[in-house]
């Protein structure tokens, strides 16, 4: 019996208390459960857009962590980020209140629906949102939880009354294998989270289990442009796997005739899936996003729709309501024909994809790409130092801020200066400089930027708050400069 199957359990639970409710994953769980009728309360150390959204819904959000916060709770939900010395966690143990992980709660919520789980090193959030777009277009009204804010809904989760539950599945600590998926998506597999997995083989094994756990009537969708994914699925014969790609001619779903213009990608899709006797072409699919990586993300959504025999005409136009994900190549603003972009990219593969997209735009308008990168976690920089050194070669100027530690202690003898020096030694043509204080960013950028340039701010830390105000700051500096010139002339 699941939490959803027995509606009477809602009143028996008492309060579901969520520790760290402001996190992107936890806030989604909270919103879905609240809309299902559960009594939800949570706590977090800081307020953010997620906690404010939950408060507006009517959810009690407590500031800080305190043992008294769990009073009246019937269940406590925690994420992997919550340490065992957390006072609320300790109080729940003493009170013998059941403590379950976010992944376990997500699994329970998904169990009464047809569960579609999207995992992979990169592109999970966008892929999840694109699948939701097609399902909405087909009138299927799914329930959705993503790892980012969907711009068309201003939330990362919403409840639908249909049969499908579409959710991003976090692979960082192997909890994604707990999700009772009927359909599993793997976007790619990259060297990441080795602090948990210890080695790359263990990470690959977790993805294998993710597929093997599917029921006999389920199927996986996998990107075979990714060589690691390609090698993985070649060894799995006990589950149905639909493949997609751009470069791979053998993919069941393949995009070709790709064109980009004015923020849109258009392409044709060749279908060689199991349920088609002959090859089928969908022409002129339009995606309101740029970049090869986003086209690949859309192909995963198309693959699921095709396998479920959804209307091909609806599939073709299924992305028209896609408004993007917050911090995924988000245009913050413009000033003096200069564009400021904010992006969550914090892994070398993500950085390369983001820079490639910016480079395409800049080249068309004869501008430059000026990148500002905030490294995220000492452990990630140490683990992927060589990859970080080589991923910025297509920018014209690069500024690297101090490392956002995300709670880690500096035990790696690394700094942002280490990365700056390494990049300088490899790419003499790239202008690269450290930024010791992001408050100085507007003045630094203002002195360098020219019309038609793209200013690209990347990182998973607090660089986003600097990106949010940069256009206004640059505009203010421009006005001051113009006023100063006029005053001097007079």
Curated annotation (Swiss-Prot):
ATP binds at residues 120-126. It comes from the Bacteria. InterPro entries: Mur-like_cat_sf (IPR036565), Mur_ligase_C (IPR004101), Mur_ligase_C_dom_sf (IPR036615), Mur_ligase_cen (IPR013221), Mur_ligase_N (IPR000713), MurCDEF_pg_biosynth (IPR050061), UDP-N-AcMur_Ala_ligase_MurC (IPR005758). Keywords: ATP-binding, Cell cycle, Cell division, Cell shape, Cell wall biogenesis/degradation, Cytoplasm, Ligase, Nucleotide-binding, Peptidoglycan synthesis. GO terms for cellular component: cytoplasm. It catalyses: UDP-N-acetyl-alpha-D-muramate + L-alanine + ATP = UDP-N-acetyl-alpha-D-muramoyl-L-alanine + ADP + phosphate + H(+). One of its GO terms (biological process) is cell division. Its EC number is 6.3.2.8. One of its GO terms (molecular function) is ATP binding. Pathway: Cell wall biogenesis; peptidoglycan biosynthesis. It is found in: Cytoplasm. Pfam families: Mur_ligase, Mur_ligase_C, Mur_ligase_M. Cell wall formation. Belongs to the MurCDEF family. This is UDP-N-acetylmuramate--L-alanine ligase. It comes from Orientia tsutsugamushi (strain Boryong) (Rickettsia tsutsugamushi). The gene is murC.
